[in-house]
Amino acid sequence: MPAISNDWKEKLMPEYAKPYYKKLFDFVKEEYSKFIIYPPANDIFNALHFTPLKNVKVVIIGQDPYHEENQAHGLCFSVLPGNQTPPSLQNIYKELNNDLGCFIPNNGYLKKWADQGVLLLNAVLTVRAHNANSHAGHGWEQFTDAIINIINLENRPVVFMLWGAYAQKKTELLNNPKHLILKAPHPSPLSAARGFFGCKHFSKANNFLIENGENPIDWQIENL
């Protein structure tokens, strides 16, 4: 697995010393040697590479990476250029259009958000090709919970967007009154109409950031 070189490195050092991480490291290494695994190994930690801790303003939590070829690149909900926009992200774009008037772009590449401080964190950071959730229960959840804990302890306001029951379980890790926790159903076509549409999380996040002296996020993804 690639090394993390920014300010996450020191904060995550205690995790690397724990027995679960050694097991996780060995499991992931073996999986990449035997199977097609997504994302490519160099992209596993892109959420952390693109969004240093000091820059984190918003956290969006996903479950595990896309499991088809050339989609996943280490940011939840995001796909590499050249892919069709997945259904959940299409619904995120619809809500952005309704909430902030953002036009719906022709791609699903969300690095622009990550570069502005939106941590796009999957709870599980790898997956076997064509086999959703195949790497669940091997230690990634403990590692990404540690990331959430680190952000929770930050003495500055951060917005957490928790979409769907899986992400909302993470509320038990969040007890810092400085932060804003926004909850809605998942943007999946199965649940978006039950309250994701109309949640206005993006404007709520920006209003909170502005109220706390931070620059808002430019949520508009440009056409490629």
Features from the language model and the residues they span:
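A polyanion-binding, active-site-adjacent surface
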Residues: P2, D7, P14-L162, Y166-K169, ...
